[in-house]
A protein has these predicted regions:
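Membrane-core helix-loop-helix motifs of multi-pass transport proteins
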Residues: 140-230, 585-617
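Hydrophobic mid-bilayer segments of alpha-helices in multi-pass membrane transport proteins
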Residues: 4-16, 23-54, 66-78, 129, ...
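Membrane-embedded alpha-helical segments and adjacent helix-loop junctions characteristic
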Residues: 45-144, 221-225, 229, 471-557
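Transmembrane alpha-helix interface/packing and boundary motifs in multi-pass membrane proteins
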Residues: 15-24, 113-122, 154-165, 444-450, ...
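Cytosolic Rossmann-like ligand/nucleotide-binding regulatory domains
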Residues: 22, 264-312, 358, 364-401
Length: 624
């Protein structure tokens, strides 16, 4: 192994380690990796005097941000917003009501719609649109939302595999394949290999992934609809019913004990028993604001302040009955809200929200104190801090109080998803027709190779803007900028894998270890390894690292790279074991009331089924 190869391997291992650690967001980690390569290249060239360094060219280190894959991912997100604005999605979801009477049909109808929508728009956006619909219909029919939301999230992920634009890994695989094969065509020494695989094959089109991705989506949707939801742990199921449609029973808020409170003189244990265990007191707030764990035998005294875990509906009843009050600062902020339409709204922190990693102070500054944070609910890990010290995470459910118009405005600007019954907004029929026609035209231009996918989608965006379907204020709102930065930074890192020859070294090692194994098993192994990585790090980063390795293995074996690239595409999109593996999984964590360990119960059998079902299908449509 050369010095350059060792450096690239060290950087990639470091990137994977930082991804798994989770201290910094994935886009920051990707930039750290890119910058590390640039610094290493400067040292190798300027200090070690190795002018032939193949690490990375510092002058073109940022070229990844102009890569077609990056532009295509951003364009798909913008088009998703335009389709939502036109009313197309709402028109589809309005047809789901008749199917909600039967539980299996209820789950199946939501999952099918989610999968179809995710094939043509961002899967997180599709899930966000269907989440309120799922919660509303589950409540109306007395079903636990936990039985609905995990199948719905998994179906959104599965649907993205059907088309080239459905998920970032497919876009990455498609563009990487074109660039790699073109590079080979320019190398005389690769002529024998190209002749063996039948020359340079055509580019992957819009539906090139459909034979495999469609089967995976079909298998997955049938599984989660018929079997999967039955595997969700019973202790993860939220109670059902209209009164608790969106209410989580683990909200954290602050209360104080006034002079007239009936709890004075009782022990904390007696207070919890008196409330029917509906309120758990888990923190005592000292005068300096610090929180300590209280003794259950401590007596309640006037003026004491506590952190409690309680359902908001139960808290109101307890306050009315006992005289318990909200903490003074919280109460004063509520009293300062003016307006007749003051109410409570529950919102979920989405992956794109500016609140992620921020505290209540940031929320107050962004909303000009027009919205009050009443409580926070988080699944998996208890919150042992005061509300002002809590750092928000993806999937947290926030209970906000304020004027309804203010809450809706700030929820939209901060990318918070309201968990409230919403009226289905049906766009003007002509706008729906035009929006669909423009999108279909863009796809046809790409399918028939009249125009590259990236440019045809940019043309569609311009049409949406000119026709008023996509207001300028919404133009960049839906773009997932951390993913864009991740892709732009990781593409040069992926290129360094190839330019230093490290992919060849890894491929040789793999072939030596698997020389006695049949070729199909190597495809399956590559898929499984990719799946494992995708469960703990971003799927786009996984595809960028594993695609060159898959191609290197194919080159060593002297076979077509397509089955290996398809295995990477499928594996990178299958992140079903943890809530951190995919943004869709994180989005339902709070509303579904799931624990961290609930995902693998359904996700592991699903991933096994996908490997068993997809490998033969890959080899049928993409033979060696």
């Amino acid at each position: 192994m050369t010095l350059e190869q060792g450096i690239v391997l060290g950087v990639i291992v470091g990137i994977f380690g930082l991804f798994a650690w989770g201290k910094w967001r994935y886009d920051i980690v990707a930039v750290i990796g890119l910058f590390s390569l640039v610094v290493a290249d400067v040292i190798v060239v300027k200090v070690l005097r190795r002018e032939d360094s193949a690490l990375i060219d510092p002058e073109s280190a940022l070229a990844g941000f102009g890569h077609p894959a990056v532009i295509t991912v951003a364009a798909v997100l913008v088009i998703s917003r335009a389709l939502r604005n036109s009313g197309v999605v709402d028109l589809i979801t309005r047809q789901l009501a008749p199917f909600a009477k039967n539980q299996t049909l209820h789950i199946a109808s939501l999952c099918v719609v989610a999968a179809v929508l995710s094939a043509f728009m961002n899967n997180v956006g599709a899930l966000a649109l269907l989440l309120p619909v799922a919660l509303k219909t589950a409540s109306e029919h007395g079903r636990s939302p936990s039985l609905i939301l995990m199948p719905l999230a998994f179906a959104s992920i599965l649907g993205g595999m059907i088309t080239m634009i459905g998920t970032p890994p497919n876009i990455i695989i498609s563009t990487f394949r074109d660039e790699y094969l073109q590079t080979l065509a320019d190398q005389p020494e690769a002529a024998a290999y190209l002749d063996k695989i039948g020359g340079v094959p055509d580019s992957f089109g819009m539906f090139a992934f459909a034979p495999v991705g469609g089967l995976v989506a079909l298998l997955g949707v049938v599984f989660v609809t018929v079997i999967g939801w039955r595997l969700i742990p019973k202790d993860s199921l939220k109670s059902a019913g209209k009164d608790e449609m969106f209410a989580l029973k683990e909200y954290i808020t602050e209360v104080r004990v006034p002079e007239e409170c009936s709890f004075i003189g009782m022990t904390l244990g007696e207070v919890e028993k008196d409330t029917g265990e509906k309120m758990m007191i888990f923190g005592f707030i000292k005068k300096d604001g610090k929180v300590m764990t209280p003794n259950r035998n401590n007596l309640v005294r006037a003026g004491s302040r506590y952190l409690v875990k309680v359902d908001p509906v139960d808290l109101k009843a307890i306050m009315d009955q006992s005289g318990l009050r909200l903490e003074k600062e919280l109460r004063s902020r509520i009293d300062n809200i003016e307006g007749e339409d003051v109410n409570f709204t529950e919102v979920v922190v989405t992956p794109n929200s500016q609140l992620v990693g921020r505290s209540r102070a940031f929320l107050r500054s962004r909303t000009s104190n027009s919205v009050v944070l009443m409580a926070v609910a988080r699944q998996g890990q208890p919150i042992q801090k005061r509300l002002g010290d809590v750092e928000f995470r993806v999937g947290d459910v926030l209970l906000l109080q304020g004027v309804q118009d203010n809450i809706e405005e700030h929820a939209a600007s901060l990318h918070l998803l309201p968990l409230a019954e919403r009226e289905v907004r049906v766009g003007i029929f002509s706008k729906i027709t035009i929006a669909v026609a423009i999108f279909v035209a863009a796809i046809l231009l790409s399918m028939f190779k009249i125009m590259p996918t990236t440019l045809s989608f940019l043309g569609a965006i311009l049409a949406y803007v000119f026709l008023g379907i996509l207001p300028l204020r919404d133009l960049y709102r839906e773009i997932d900028w951390p993913v864009i930065v991740l892709l732009g930074a990781m593409i040069p890192v992926s290129g360094a894998l190839q330019s230093t020859g490290l992919t060849g070294e890894i491929a040789t090692a793999v072939n030596n270890l698997t020389e006695s194994m049949p070729a199909w098993s190597i495809v399956a192994l590559l898929m499984v390894v990719t799946m494992c990585l995708s469960d703990v790090i971003n799927n786009a980063a996984t595809a960028l690292i594993m695609a060159p390795i898959g191609v290197g293995i194919a080159l060593q074996m002297g076979v077509s790279p397509d089955p290996f690239l398809m295995a990477v595409a499928v594996g990178a999109s299958c992140a079903f074991l943890t809530p951190i593996g995919h943004q869709c999984n994180a989005l339902i964590l709070g509303p579904g009331g799931y624990r961290f360990g609930a995902y693998w119960r359904m996700g592991l059998p699903l991933e096994i089924l996908i490997v068993i079902g997809s490998v033969p299908w890959i080899l049928k449509f993409f033979p060696f």
